[in-house]
Amino acid sequence: MQLGAFSVSLSVKDLAASRAFYEALGFSVTGGDPAQNWLVLRSNGTVIGLFQGMFEGNLLTFNPGWDQYRQELGQFQDVRELQDALDAQGIALTTRTDPDGQGTGYLQLADPDGNVILIDQHVERPKAR
């Protein structure tokens, strides 16, 4: 499976305090909107998202269609293909994407220890190969 770019999405209580903490560790803001309570920070190839009041717990996040620097890939495994592959393996999904969609989409699942995994596609389905 080609899951795409990886990041850790952290649920934070105080966006400004978390931003200052991660900047002290060498991360820089590369995206997001503080007015909407979220930021994306990067340190070399490591990406974290800070989200205040958007979800409970932390998420492992994959973005099909992007490389680690948010550059759109020409060919990639679409979120709907990933959903079909996970279904075929008998892996339970907690949130499903529209199987007939063409654009963006997301799905969620949890590993055996309850860690939530978000597969969140922000780009259009790739053209047929």
Predicted regions and their residues:
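Conserved short beta-strand elements that form part of the metal-binding/catalytic scaffold
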Residues: 28-70, 116-121
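N-terminal beta-strand motif that seeds the catalytic metal site of vicinal oxygen chelate
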Residues: 1-20, 122-129
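Conserved acetyl-CoA-binding loop of GNAT-fold acetyltransferases
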Residues: 23-30, 91
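Vicinal oxygen chelate
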Residues: 13-16, 54-55, 62-116, 123
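Loop/turn position at the start of each blade in beta-propeller repeats
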Residues: 3, 36, 102-104
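Structural preference for long, well-ordered alpha-helical segments within the folded cores
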Residues: 20-24, 113
